Amino acid sequence: MSQVHKTKIVVSPWTVLLLAVFAAMGSPVLLAALLLAALCHELGHYVALRVFGAGVDAVYISAFGAELRLSDRPPLSYGQEILAVAAGPAANLLFSAVLSRCGKQMPELYIFAGAQLVLAFFNLLPVRPLDGGTLVWLLLAWRIDPFAADRGARWIGGIVTAALLLCSLWLLVRSGNPFLLLGVVGLGKSFWAEKGLVKRKETR
């Protein structure tokens, strides 16, 4: 009989605080749309990982996203990991298309479709630890070299983060809206906290 793999879920206190502030200041419908989009995103990752036989030991949920910690065995190939990473945004795009189609009968669903679309494109930004940055690293490591992939991913992520910072500062000056700036600062903090090489090509 196969053993059931248990997955631990850890939620950061900052996540709870952020949700409480958002619920107090924003629309409950928008909050529900964002939570559903996040759930669909992580479900896409999880289903793909389980299809490839990978065990998910824990899910860490922070104010800036979620991280799935995998068990050591069995290791995924580069191709499998690329598909598993891409499955998150792909799930958002799929649900966005379905919700948009249903929105013809229920216009409120367009908000949910939009949240799915925004989360998909945000996660495809080529900045680690976002999915887009991870995909850049995996593709470079697969085709060139893992150490060169580290350098390339950091350069690309740094340039994109700097561009986003300039755009958010411009928006702050023009409209006085600090939310994009706070998001970019949080993304930049996660980017600079990213560790170096964690995989070797010869193990794939």
Where do the language-model regions lie?
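Hydrophobic transmembrane alpha-helices and their immediate loop junctions
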Residues: M1-R204
